[in-house]
Amino acid sequence: MDNEIFDIAIIGAGPAGLFAQFYAGLRELKTALIEATPRIGGQITALYPEKTILDVAGFLGISGRDLVNELKLQTDLVDSKTFLNSEVTNLKKIASHFEIEINHHASFLAKSVIIASGNGSFSPRKIDVPGSSEAEQSGMLTYLLPGLSEVADKDFAVVGGGNTAVDYAVELIDHDCHVSLIHRRDNFRAMESSVTKLKNSRRTNFLTPMKITGLSPKKEKLEIELQSVPDGAVKRVSVDRLIGGFGFTASSRTINQWEEFPEQFNQGFLTNEAQMTSIAGIFAIGDASIYPGKSDLIATAFGEAPTAINQAVNYFDPDRGGPQHSTSLNKKEVFKHDRIKSRYNS
């Protein structure tokens, strides 16, 4: 890896980074995809591989795991390098290149950098009530969906009022579970169609406006103590498992130590219409990017990736030309792939 020079280094192997790797390959750019963890897929792989994703064009619905697999198949079509277990511990400018330090020792050079690292590492916002530690140790309190092949006809409770909790509840009723949805308010801050689906399902029990005041693991069930928000009345329910759906907090401590550190707002890097950050040659896409009017969707990230790639080329090789349509790119190698041949030669 040392002394190797790439056209583009993409930091982060979530959906945005994977699609950027594929598009860069279509443009025949020498590309490195760098991922700090042992697996590709980013937040999807870590947090919701079983979740059905509805906002990706061309799919009526696709699980997080299947989407990552499809993206991996795309990247296999092009010539590029992927480095796993490789945390970018420093990024600095050297002459006309960026030096990228990996795991505090190995390094290589890139003509441009695309940050696709999302919001960094994630940890769940945990429930803090009497008995919550014991419930988590017993496995009856979790913060991620279980394997959905094993949950049919189980009784679950999900707590929270945002997209995380509502999405969890929808996945569970879609797999024939009974779900009690606990929220301290009557209204939910989530996709309206998902809330409507829960309201129309006989498998959903709304426990609102209520809050959890205690947890008590029994032999096979978890007893949840609830308190009514308006009048303080206490109620108890028993479930097979409780899932915390308060979302996750992000940490970007390693990124914050880079020598070249673009301007940030909240957890994202401020980008312009070219997806360029405050530092020329460094771009950001997906959840790592923020700009006025942005929608934090996978679909948005997929659109940002080609913009960043094409503008990166314009940065380090302005004579090479601007945006390219897929029909004008070199597909000679791509169409050697059996899966592509079978689709287009039928």
From Swiss-Prot:
GO terms for molecular function: ferredoxin-NADP+ reductase activity; flavin adenine dinucleotide binding; NADP binding. Its cofactor is FAD. It is an enzyme of class 1 (oxidoreductase). Gene3D superfamilies: FAD/NAD(P)-binding domain. FAD binds at residues 35, 43, 48, 88, 122, 287, 327. It catalyses: 2 reduced [2Fe-2S]-[ferredoxin] + NADP(+) + H(+) = 2 oxidized [2Fe-2S]-[ferredoxin] + NADPH. Its EC number is 1.18.1.2. Binds 1 FAD per subunit. It comes from the Bacteria. Keywords: FAD, Flavoprotein, NADP, Oxidoreductase. Disulfide bonds: none annotated. InterPro entries: FAD/NAD-bd_sf, FAD/NAD-binding_dom, Fd--NADP_Rdtase_type_2, Ferredoxin-NADP_redctase_2. It holds the Pfam family Pyr_redox_2. Belongs to the ferredoxin--NADP reductase type 2 family. Homodimer. This is Ferredoxin--NADP reductase. It comes from Oenococcus oeni (strain ATCC BAA-331 / PSU-1). The lineage of its organism: Bacteria, Bacillati, Bacillota, Bacilli, Lactobacillales.
